[in-house]
């Protein structure tokens, strides 16, 4: 069972008080993940600690639960009951903003020279939230308040293609994880981990990437 050192916890005041009374060691075991939420450019998880009641649940950033992979995977399974839990990506499969260019494998070098090729926008997929909605220069706290909607009521839906109105942007959090900022058809603004977005609304993600690609013809001399 993964354990987390006391000094790594972002909210540990209540746990420390309980620890003083019971003489527990300076490590806590993750029993399960209850829910998640967007926090700026990152995802936080509401964690239930083994041996502690719900009153001691704390919100922890992704890096604080990195050692609790099984608990996090089990949580994502509850968010998508029809799919298996996301498997751990290998080094070669690590997904970064710089790898989001869509480049078809050419059938031959001559054919490739005649085809258009794609490249991401100057700033890549990481872009500011749509300036048309008044977010130019918005702080992380401002974005938190805007994109604070809950995904709980959508968790039982197999597909979110019909409930996601639009993907506004995809940004890379401090831990390296890509996060989708979306507006639902009900008007609420939410943050979605990319692995969940790729399962629930893959076409919406594809349309977003296509919209932010720039096409340019290849020089015949290249």
Swiss-Prot record:
Subcellular localization(s) per the UniProt record: Nucleus
Occurrences of domain Chromo (ranges): 28-87
Listed transmembrane segments: none
Highest rank taxon of the organism: Eukaryota
Biased amino acid composition, Basic and acidic residues: 1-15
One Pfam match: Chromo
UniProt region (Disordered), positions on chain: 1-26, 77-147
One Gene Ontology cellular component annotation held by this UniProt entry: heterochromatin
Phenotype of null mutants: Mildly decreases methylation of the fifth carbon of cytosine (5mC) in DNA.
Residue ranges, compositional bias (Acidic residues): 16-26
Listed GO biological process terms: chromatin remodeling; regulation of biosynthetic process
Keywords for this protein: Nucleus
Alphabetical list of Gene3D superfamilies matching this protein: 2.40.50.40
PANTHER family from the UniProt entry: CHROMOBOX PROTEIN
Subunit composition and interactions: Interacts with DMT5.
Protein's job: Recognizes and binds histone H3 tails methylated at 'Lys-9', leading to epigenetic repression. Localizes DMT5 to heterochromatin characterized by trimethylation of histone H3 tails at 'Lys-9'.
Protein name: Chromatin-associated protein SWI6
Species for this entry: Cryptococcus neoformans var. grubii serotype A (strain H99 / ATCC 208821 / CBS 10515 / FGSC 9487)
